[in-house]
């Protein structure tokens, strides 16, 4: 009997086990089928969802992006963000009944949001942003009573905002920005007591701003920018005391700004781009929490209230594009944290108040297109951080303050269309970071200062419509970055300098309406980027160079020069000459050619008679007129100078592989050795040979896997030549921005490049004795070998410095877009200057954009996007598609902006930077580096799912951190 009882017990236990197994297997199978149906509706899944395989891997809880409950084994979270997935969202999504979170952002999913999503009643988090979804927002979403976060921004959704969204009791974040939604904002939405974030910008919404908007007692973010809202700002706006960001800009809102707006406690108030009228309420001056006040592009009238000077925490004040009158209040000089002041395009009168010189953090001052008179106050030069100064289109007079030479951070100076007079100060040539100088439309006289040729970062130079005389400086040939030169409508004489032929980046050369004479230099045909040439109405003579790149210019470019001849001006040069002149010209040409031939033969004979021998390191013998070849590493000893010249055919142009601001780079390939890169420096004779050689020997002693080795150098009649390792994949600049880029850089490769460059720079800063500062970190100075290992280059211009000192640069001052503003202001150099530049390189790697492009500054763009919570929109598509963890991208953005903090003391060291980047490298590292074009197949990564990198609160904190530290 006892045995029977025992057997019954065993059968009961066995039955319970079977029941539990069946109970657990069944839902797994159902959810597994749902996941496979979801996969089937996607495209571009080949390399992304390899482990989603119900044949070889039944454990779907281990599939990529799938997270299950530890007890029930039900799918509770699905994260397939930023995988470049196409196709549609399957209706099988509704079969995942226990789903609590789904993130499909950053893909290319089309189609409609399936109604079946309403079956996932446990959903608390939904992010379908940045896809190609279209159609209406399904009403079934209102069934999701647990939903707290709904992000559908950056799609193509149409139709109205469903009023049923108001039935979701726990909804805290609703972001529908940048779609094509129409209709009005449902009034019931304003009665959701828990709603904290409402983003509706960039749609086609109509209606008015409801007085009920202030019923949202928990709302801190209200953004309806860029819609078609009409009506007025409700008087009850002052009751919206929970608002921190209020943006109703770029709508059709009319009327006056209500007085009650002064009761708000917002940090950002954006009303720009509407049709607001009336005066600026003085009560705004009492809004002490304001960091950004933007009332621009309206129809506001009256004076600027002096009480705005009380806004001591405001960093940005935009009042441009209105009809404001009166004078600029001196009280604005009390806004101690002001970085941006834009008062342009108004009707302001009077003088520029000297009190503005107290704004030590001022970055941009724009007073253009007003009716200002008088002088520019000299103490504007006290604004040490000033980067852009624009007073175009006023009635200012007098001379340009000589103190402007102290504005080391200034990159944009526009004094055009005023009544300035006197000579152009030579001191302007000391503002080393200028990229735009516009003095056109004034009464400047005298000659053009030769010092302007020292502005090596200058992109635009406009001196037109003045009373300048003298000649066009030959020093303009040093403006290696220049794109536009306009000196038209002056009284310039002399000839066109042949040195202008050195300007490889020039796009427009405008010299018309002067008194320039002589011939058009043939050297201008070397300016291959030249697209606009105007030399009309001068006294030029001779033949227009018959080169192909001159055929692009219209005949009008040459009109008004009666002694010019050529097909372009309808005057054929040759046939009209008398026979005697033809004979004389032929005779002269023959004699000149004969003389040149004789000189060449003598030179060749002398050159052949001298056998060049390498000089070992340390030797000081250097015969006059001979070549000195210095070997720094023995692997260079197999080369002789004659060999190098023979292989490169005396540095023929066809061996050129790159240009720099101060050098040309050639490739030398020998059958008996590996290729080397030859850098030919423009400045052939440094002032101190011994110092020059000592620096090169110091640099040549550096051996590190992330630093390009200097193997030797030569002082020769061909110039000063430096011999480096040849890097197969060129520079990072070439791969990111070059016109012929052949590979795509995935995130893993970019991270590898960043780590390598950081380790190389950390070695220079911390492991060299004396320590070494690079001074010109930029993407074009980060070279890549065949395995995309980064190596820092251009150490021919670096300097070693004592461990307790900093060094003020006298050779190279960096490159525009990468220059540390503090270095530009003080000319004092330390490691923090390199760290700033490295931060810009990180931004290039993340965004794929140039540091400076068409006057747009990458760093400023990212800071602006940080203010708007849109930083991640700047990420390069090749990064977002191949990075498995978007948190790594965000951390790298943070690191880049820490490196570029305005205060150098707040920047990390390169050792710290290197450690952070290394922490982002997958562990253990893959055995084989994937090609840059694709992610290694079969590689498995677990994706971070922490709330600190996925919630909007992270973006808010990110914005606040950056705003506090960088603005």
Curated annotation (Swiss-Prot):
Residues with glycosylation annotation: 70, 79, 228, 239, 310, 334, 379, 414, 443, 462, 469, 534, 539, 549
Gene name of the record: ERL2
Signal peptide boundaries: 1-27
Pfam families (alphabetical): LRR_1 (PF00560), LRRNT_2 (PF08263), Pkinase (PF00069)
Organism this protein belongs to: Arabidopsis thaliana (Mouse-ear cress)
Keyword Metal-binding (UniProt): no
Catalytic activity: L-seryl-[protein] + ATP = O-phospho-L-seryl-[protein] + ADP + H(+); L-threonyl-[protein] + ATP = O-phospho-L-threonyl-[protein] + ADP + H(+)
Cytoplasmic topological domain residue ranges: 607-967
Tissue distribution of the protein: Mostly expressed in developing organs, including bud clusters, flowers, siliques and young rosettes. Also detected in mature aboveground organs, such as leaves, stems and pedicels, but barely in roots.
Keywords recorded for this protein, A-Z: ATP-binding, Glycoprotein, Kinase, Leucine-rich repeat, Membrane, Nucleotide-binding, Phosphoprotein, Receptor, Repeat, Serine/threonine-protein kinase, Signal, Transferase, Transmembrane, Transmembrane helix
EC category: transferase
Residues given in the record as ATP binding sites: 657-665, 679
Enzyme Commission number(s) from the entry: 2.7.11.1
Active site: 776
Per-repeat ranges for LRR: 74-97, 98-120, 122-145, 146-166, 170-192, 194-216, 218-240, 242-261, 265-287, 289-311, 313-335, 337-359, 361-382, 385-406, 409-431, 433-456, 457-479, 481-503, 505-527, 529-550
Topology in membrane: Single-pass type I membrane protein
Function: Receptor kinase that regulates inflorescence architecture and organ shape as well as stomatal patterning, including density and clustering, together with ERL1 and ER.
Biased composition (Basic and acidic residues): 936-946
Region (Disordered): 921-955
Phosphothreonine found at: 640, 648, 826
UniProt topological domain (Extracellular) ranges: 28-585
Phosphotyrosine: modified positions: 724, 763, 818
Name this protein carries in UniProt: LRR receptor-like serine/threonine-protein kinase ERL2
GO CC, one annotated term: membrane
InterPro entries recorded: Kinase-like_dom_sf (IPR011009), Leu-rich_rpt (IPR001611), Leu-rich_rpt_typical-subtyp (IPR003591), LRR_dom_sf (IPR032675), LRR_N_plant-typ (IPR013210), Plant_LRR-RLKs (IPR050647), Prot_kinase_dom (IPR000719), Protein_kinase_ATP_BS (IPR017441)
């Amino acid at each position: 009997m006892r045995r029977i009882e025992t057997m019954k017990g065993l059968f009961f236990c066995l039955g319970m086990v079977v029941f539990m197994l069946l109970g657990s297997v069944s839902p797994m199978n159902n959810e597994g089928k749902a996941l496979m149906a979801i996969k089937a509706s996607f495209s571009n899944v080949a390399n992304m969802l390899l482990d989603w395989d119900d044949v070889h891997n039944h454990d779907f809880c281990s599939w990529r992006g799938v997270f299950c409950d530890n007890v029930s084994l039900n799918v509770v979270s699905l994260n397939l963000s930023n995988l470049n997935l196409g196709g549609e969202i399957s209706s099988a999504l509704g079969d995942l009944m226990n789903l609590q979170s789904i993130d499909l952002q950053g893909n290319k999913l089309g189609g409609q949001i399936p109604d079946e999503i309403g079956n996932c009643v446990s959903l608390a988090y939904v992010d379908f942003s940045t896809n190609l979804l279209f159609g209406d927002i399904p009403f079934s979403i209102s069934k999701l009573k647990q939903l707290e976060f709904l992000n559908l921004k950056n799609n193509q959704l149409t139709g109205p905002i469903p009023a049923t969204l108001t039935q979701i009791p726990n909804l805290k974040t609703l972001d529908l920005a940048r779609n094509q939604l129409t209709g009005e904002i449902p009034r019931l939405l304003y009665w959701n007591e828990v709603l904290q974030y409402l983003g509706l910008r960039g749609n086609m919404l109509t209606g008015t701003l409801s007085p009920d908007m202030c019923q949202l007692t928990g709302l801190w973010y209200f953004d309806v920018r860029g819609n078609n809202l009409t009506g007025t700002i409700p008087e009850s706006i002052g009751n919206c005391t929970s608002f921190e960001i209020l943006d109703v800009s770029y709508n059709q809102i009319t009327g006056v700004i209500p007085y009650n707006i002064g009761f708000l406690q917002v940090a950002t108030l954006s009303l720009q781009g509407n049709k607001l009228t009336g005066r600026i309420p003085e009560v705004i001056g009492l809004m002490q929490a304001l960091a950004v006040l933007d009332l621009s592009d309206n129809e506001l009238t009256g004076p600027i209230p002096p009480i705005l000077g009380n806004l001591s925490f405001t960093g940005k004040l935009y009042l441009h594009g209105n009809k404001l009158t009166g004078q600029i209040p001196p009280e604005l000089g009390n806004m101690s944290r002001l970085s941006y002041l834009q008062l342009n395009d108004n009707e302001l009168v009077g003088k520029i108040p000297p009190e503005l010189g107290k704004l030590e953090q001022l970055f941009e001052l724009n007073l253009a297109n007003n009716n200002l008179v008088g002088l520019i106050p000299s103490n504007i030069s006290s604004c040490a951080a000033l980067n852009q100064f624009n007073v175009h289109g006023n009635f200012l007079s007098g001379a340009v303050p000589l103190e402007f030479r102290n504005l080391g951070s200034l990159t944009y100076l526009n004094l055009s269309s005023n009544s300035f007079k006197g000579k152009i100060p030579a001191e302007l040539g000391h503002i080393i970071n200028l990229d735009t100088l516009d003095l056109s439309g004034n009464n400047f006289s005298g000659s053009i200062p030769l010092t302007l040729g020292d502005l090596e970062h200058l992109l635009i130079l406009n001196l037109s419509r003045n009373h300048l005389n003298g000649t066009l400086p030959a020093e303009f040939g040093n403006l290696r970055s220049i794109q536009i030169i306009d000196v038209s409508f002056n009284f310039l004489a002399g000839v066109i300098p042949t040195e202008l032929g050195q300007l490889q980046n020039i796009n427009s050369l405008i010299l018309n309406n002067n008194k320039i004479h002589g011939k058009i230099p043939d050297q201008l045909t070397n300016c291959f980027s030249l697209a606009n040439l105007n030399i009309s109405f001068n006294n030029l003579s001779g033949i227009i160079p018959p080169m192909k790149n001159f055929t692009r210019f219209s005949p009008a470019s040459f009109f008004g020069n009666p002694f010019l001849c050529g097909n372009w001006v309808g005057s054929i040069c040759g046939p009209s000459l008398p026979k005697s002149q033809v004979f004389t010209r032929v005779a002269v040409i023959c004699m000149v050619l004969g003389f040149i031939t004789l000189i060449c033969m003598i030179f060749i004979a002398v050159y052949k008679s001298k056998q060049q021998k390498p000089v070992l390191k340390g030797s000081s013998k250097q015969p006059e007129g001979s070549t000195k070849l210095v070997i720094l590493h023995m692997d260079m000893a197999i080369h002789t100078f004659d060999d190098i010249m023979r292989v490169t055919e005396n540095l023929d142009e066809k061996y050129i592989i790159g240009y720099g601001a101060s050098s040309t780079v050639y490739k030398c390939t020998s059958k008996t050795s590996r290729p080397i890169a030859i850098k030919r420096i423009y400045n052939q004779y440094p002032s101190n040979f011994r110092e020059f050689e000592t620096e090169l020997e110091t640099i040549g002693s550096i051996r590190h896997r992330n630093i390009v080795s200097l193997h030797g150098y030569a002082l020769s009649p061909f110039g000063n030549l430096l011999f480096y390792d040849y890097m197969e994949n060129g520079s990072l600049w070439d791969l990111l921005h070059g016109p012929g880029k052949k590979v795509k850089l995935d995130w893993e490769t970019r991270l590898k490049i960043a780590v390598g460059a950081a380790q190389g720079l950390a070695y220079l800063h911390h492991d060299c004795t004396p320590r070494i500062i690079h001074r010109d970190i930029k993407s074009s100075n980060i070279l890549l070998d065949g395995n995309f290992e980064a190596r820092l280059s251009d150490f021919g211009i670096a300097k070693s410095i004592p461990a307790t000192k900093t060094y003020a640069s006298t050779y190279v001052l960096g490159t525009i877009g990468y220059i540390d503003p503090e270095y530009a202001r003080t000319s004092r150099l330390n490691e923090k200057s390199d760290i700033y530049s490295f931060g810009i390189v990180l931004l290039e790697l993340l965004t794929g954009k140039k540091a400076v492009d068409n006057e747009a500054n990458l760093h400023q763009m990212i800071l602006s996007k940080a203010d708007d919570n849109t930083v991640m929109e700047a990420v390069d598509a090749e990064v977002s598609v191949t990075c498995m963890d978007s948190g790594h991208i965000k951390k790298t953005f943070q690191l880049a902006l820490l490196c570029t903090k305005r205060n150098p003391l707040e920047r990390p060291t390169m050792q710290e930077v290197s450690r952070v980047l290394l922490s982002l490298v997958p562990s253990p590292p893959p055995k084989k580096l994937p090609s840059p074009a694709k992610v290694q197949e079969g590689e498995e990564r677990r994706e971070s799912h922490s709330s600190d990198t996925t919630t909007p609160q992270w973006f808010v904190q990110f914005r606040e951190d950056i705003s506090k530290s960088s603005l």
